[in-house]
């Protein structure tokens, strides 16, 4: 900015004397900035709740994809047809099973004294992350142990990855052992459950 421009700006003597050079509105770094966009996509996928951690090949768990597929198929069918009713029943059954599992987890958390925090602890989104990657192995082992020793999950269910995040939170709160003990008392596996 020369002296004339400075004086014009300072005194506001005439309009239009403060036109900025066009190159000032150009980006400082020119060229392809795709490396930043690629990084953001990878970061989102790594934190994606519905896939296995660090697995970039899919974005949802199998049961989520199956549910979405059923819903899309049902929406294309004629309402109240026999096939529509079957799909509607399957969708309802899967959603009800998920609600029951969530309610079991909530009851245990409330028994641990997390009455106000239970919903927050159970809330897992795509932005959720594992607090410490070192906890991942322990959280998975404890989730498998929970599945093997309790009926908190329905028989034949794959372990939902979203509960891995909750186990990680319980590890951070140092409440995971108490959670397992209460779960084993409230939802023990019977001999009949083991034989299935």
Curated annotation (Swiss-Prot):
Can you provide one Gene Ontology molecular function annotated for this UniProt record?
Answer: phosphatidylinositol binding
One GO cellular component, as annotated: apical plasma membrane
Checking Pfam families in the record gives:
MREG
Q: What is its main location?
A: membrane
Q: Does the keyword 4Fe-4S apply?
A: no
Family according to the record: Belongs to the melanoregulin family.
Enumerate the PANTHER family for this protein.
Answer: MELANOREGULIN
* Role noted for this protein: Probably functions as a cargo-recognition protein that couples cytoplasmic vesicles to the transport machinery. Contributes to retrograde melanosome transport from the cell periphery to the center. Overexpression causes accumulation of late endosomes and/or lysosomes at the microtubule organising center (MTOC) at the center of the cell. Probably binds cholesterol and requires the presence of cholesterol in membranes to function in microtubule-mediated retrograde organelle transport.
Query: What is this protein identified as?
Result: Melanoregulin
